[in-house]
């Protein structure tokens, strides 16, 4: 049973190296980190995860996912290491491609590239992203990175990113590249997954909704000439509810990612992860 663990917020109370090692020892399948480089003090954007739209105070306390996963890779040897998610419009593909390929190489091909376009307009725009066309920008960035990962001499010419032939090394351990897993529940997300992705990373979704989405995703894949089984679904941000996890897996999820409670010490985190393992894995 593929169950992953994500880092709770605030994300720096417990060493992620310790946490990832414990996750692996307990038999979980993957370890996930998310990102927001900052949260604006003044924002008109509504938080999509709350009825009142208020951004939680905990969202001020993310860590850099690539530094965190590099730390986690050094204390583990088997578990997958995922971003859940990286805000692609806020990073340049020439640098992002190298960060990913380096992490994938040094981790032995264990990286899962969970991506998103973001919901916080002020953040996206301060980082140079085009918020109103952010998924168009994400697509272009991914296509550019695929060139960098797979070509000896890579070049790309688009609206947002334009570069002449360059050498970009190292290449990732996974071939042709780490899986690109699209987050979110936007209207066209499943079409995007089939067109240029390798998986889907939904959050707020019920087993019935997932079953319908899996059927749609499989149909779109067949219509595009792709093997439906090559496209994964990873359900993010779930409670440690064994019955719910089984229903999500039965509905078509390939993995379910559980978020532990926030704790402030390694001893507390070890106990929390053990509790989750005994609840959902045993």
Each model region followed by its residue ranges:
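Active-site-adjacent structural elements that line small-molecule/cofactor binding pockets in enzymes
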Residues: 1-282
């Amino acid at each position: 049973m593929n169950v992953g663990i994500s880092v709770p917020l605030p994300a720096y109370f417990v060493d992620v190296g310790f946490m990832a090692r414990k996750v692996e020892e307990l038999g979980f399948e993957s370890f996930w980190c998310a990102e927001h480089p900052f949260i604006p003090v003044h924002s008109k954007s509504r938080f999509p995860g709350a009825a009142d739209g208020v951004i939680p105070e905990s969202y001020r306390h993310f860590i850099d996912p690539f530094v965190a996963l590099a730390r986690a890779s050094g204390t583990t040897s088997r578990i997958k290491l995922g971003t859940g998610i990286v805000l692609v419009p806020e990073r340049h593909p020439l640098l992002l491609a190298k960060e990913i390929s380096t992490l994938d190489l040094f981790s032995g091909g264990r990286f899962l590239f969970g991506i998103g376009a973001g919901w916080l307009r002020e953040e996206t725009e301060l980082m140079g992203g085009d918020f109103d066309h952010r998924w168009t920008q994400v697509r272009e960035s991914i296509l550019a990175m695929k060139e960098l990962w797979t070509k000896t001499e890579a070049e790309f010419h688009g609206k947002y990113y334009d570069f002449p032939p360059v050498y970009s090394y190292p290449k990732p351990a996974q071939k042709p590249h780490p899986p690109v897993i699209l987050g979110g529940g936007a209207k066209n997300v499943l079409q995007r997954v089939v067109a240029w992705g390798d998986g889907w990373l939904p959050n707020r979704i019920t087993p019935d909704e997932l079953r319908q989405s899996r059927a749609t995703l499989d149909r779109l894949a067949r219509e595009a000439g792709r093997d439906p089984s090559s496209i994964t679904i990873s359900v993010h941000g779930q409670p440690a509810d064994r019955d719910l996890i089984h229903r999500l897996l039965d509905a078509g999820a390939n993995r379910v990612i559980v978020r532990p409670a926030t704790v402030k010490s390694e001893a507390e985190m070890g106990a929390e992860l053990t509790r989750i393992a005994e609840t959902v894995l045993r």
